[in-house]
């Protein structure tokens, strides 16, 4: 069973920045803003791990059994996903094949984003957003309820060096790496890219929901 402690949200972002330079059959992750991870996911939940076991999940093209880790979880809150609670989370058996380990202690709460498998099940990989709940900033926690969803039609583009420019009005530049040399910087922790009434997108910072004046602003 996987026993490594789960990294914090900032560590997850750092892992994505470094990527996964592994063989062709392994996974490779590109850094993304937490809002992008939310928007790309079918399911986003806050949950606690209850138990874990290795299970068979069919066979590969050569007839060999495919192993996966099945985590039984207790869902605390669903931010995005089906009406049915998530009871089981599946992942590959090791990080070498893109598996995402959860802490074996079972006491930590996590923010988990991944793909739905239906019937109360979901699948996660090393590239998905999985972080200890305590490592999620207060602004990020607020954004999970509505703000991230308000910008899922926007495009967040990573800026690697200054200067960089938007290519369209529905784009937000993610400059944490260019400005701070980290991916888990101020924009990742405190900002959401929100679509405004004129169709343009802009970064919004703050705990409170955006005021109508912000949403009604039009780009010149």
From Swiss-Prot:
Quick one: which residues bind Zn(2+)?
Answer: 27
- Would you indicate the residue range of the signal peptide? 1-26
Q: Which GO terms describe its biological process?
A: negative regulation of membrane protein ectodomain proteolysis; response to cytokine; response to hormone
Q: Where is this site: Involved in metalloproteinase-binding?
A: 40, 61, 67
Disulphide bonds in the chain: 27-98, 29-127, 39-152, 154-201, 159-164, 172-193
Q: Write out the annotated subcellular location.
A: Secreted
Region entry Involved in metalloproteinase-binding: which residue ranges?
27-30, 95-96
Keywords in alphabetical order: Disulfide bond, Metal-binding, Metalloenzyme inhibitor, Metalloprotease inhibitor, Protease inhibitor, Secreted, Signal, Zinc
- Protein modification: The activity of TIMP2 is dependent on the presence of disulfide bonds.
Source taxon at top rank: Eukaryota
Extract the Pfam families matched here. Answer: TIMP
A GO molecular function term, named singly, is: metal ion binding
Q: Name one GO cellular component term.
A: extracellular space
Family listed: Belongs to the protease inhibitor I35 (TIMP) family.
| Biological role | Complexes with metalloproteinases (such as collagenases) and irreversibly inactivates them by binding to their catalytic zinc cofactor.
Its name, as the record gives it, is: Metalloproteinase inhibitor 2
Record the organism: Gallus gallus (Chicken)
The record's gene field reads: TIMP2
